[in-house]
Amino acid sequence: MKGVFSLNYKPKALNKGDTVGVIAPASPPDPKKLDTALLFLEELGLQVKLGKALKNQHGYLAGQDDERLADLHEMFRDDEVKAVLCACGGFGTGRIAAGIDFSLIRKHPKIFWGYSDITFLHTAIHQNTGLVTFHGPMLSTDIGLDDVHPLTKASYKQLFQETEFTYTEELSPLTELVPGKAEGELVGGNLSLLTSTLGTPFEIDTRGKLLFIEDIDEEPYQIDRMLNQLKMGGKLTDAAGILVCDFHNCVPVKREKSLSLEQVLEDYIISAGRPALRGFKIGHCSPSIAVPIGAKAAMNTAEKTAVIEAGVSEGALKT
């Protein structure tokens, strides 16, 4: 695996009046939903700078690869911009990962936020720079919805405060799949994207870490195939613990005879033998709770809790 950093550092927390950059490194955002979300950022007291390719369209991509990559680089290069927020996911981040200037990001570390297809960028950036990034609800995808959950919006408060976060059953019911306690760096994201990193220079490193997974609109046999690939790659047993998050609409459609999602998850997660909890509202769900990738975390299946340290620093950058 290329450039896996052992020393992590947190970006600086935001203050009211700060400028944030909005980009679309994958697919183009819905214009109306994006406009609604930009108003939300203004309500938080933030100034907004839009990427040049944000509203471009090239098939299912938000512009050509070099345009989307240039937006990513420009937002990190611009010292006025204190955070880089992804408008939406979709498809396309894997196409630009090989061109990322990681030295630029190390020189200009700042908040990076998104999920779904953005998982590929989280893995690439974190493992090649050590920067803690945020797997969180996106602007067009989530914040721009008419019925956005208050807790989804509240996730953005993590960017302003250096506060430890404890996930309990007050947020959602949690099921113990494998008993035990575990602690380590929090890594993971969208299962489809994590699987797509295998065999690339950006292959997910789960050794001694807490792995969280989520997905949407994948049938049980597809989840089976991806978990089997992670299993054969040693990614499940390498992990210290596993957090199974939301798998929205992952039900049989094409196949009359099918295993259930629950059966597939239990086959792989239980056999991995690592402490595991299921039911976290992280991913393509409502509410959608943000978590910092690369932050230290601890899980306790008996207490049904996951404690995650702050993903930002209110002072100088912390390691």
UniProtKB/Swiss-Prot annotation:
Originating species: Bacillus subtilis (strain 168)
Assigned protein family: Belongs to the peptidase S66 family.
Lineage of the organism: Bacteria, Bacillati, Bacillota, Bacilli, Bacillales
Reported induction: Repressed by AbrB, a transcription factor that negatively controls biofilm formation.
Gene Ontology cellular component list: cytosol
Protein name in the entry: Probable murein peptide carboxypeptidase
Molecular function as annotated in GO: carboxypeptidase activity; serine-type peptidase activity
Listed Gene3D superfamilies: Class I glutamine amidotransferase-like, LD-carboxypeptidase A C-terminal domain-like
Gene (UniProt): ykfA
EC number: 3.4.16.-
Location(s), subcellular: Cytoplasm
Enzyme class: hydrolase
